[in-house]
Amino acid sequence: MKVINKILIAVLAFCMIFALVGCVDDDNTTDTVIDFDLVAMEPNSTYAMFQNLNKNTNEYLNKSFKIPGTYCLMSDGSHTVFFSDSCCSEYIEFKLKGVDAEYPELYENVVITGIGGQKTVDGQQHFYLYDAEIVE
């Protein structure tokens, strides 16, 4: 009976160790929840969302976004992602996370994620993304 108890304890210990190993996060990453995924939207819906972001900026502050587009550098030095469909075009300014952030090549198709913010330029408030990252 003592041998069976020892075997049972050993098996239980092994099972507990095996179960705990499965709880370890190998890559130490966390999945970021995206509040507004414009990649998943149809072009007309994406255009409408761009319009709404600039008209109702306060509703989108501190929300996370995933936005597709073409990287452009504006004449004032601001970095933008430019979206265009068959009839219309819009752009959103973004600032990459980190002081040594490396921006993509001009006119490269990208997908960026970032947090919605607001800035004032020439007395007008504009929506932009801060802490942005290029994900594709």
Predicted regions and their residues:
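OB-fold and OB-like single-stranded nucleic-acid-recognition modules
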Residues: A19-E136
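Bacterial N-terminal signal peptides that target proteins for export
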Residues: M1-A10
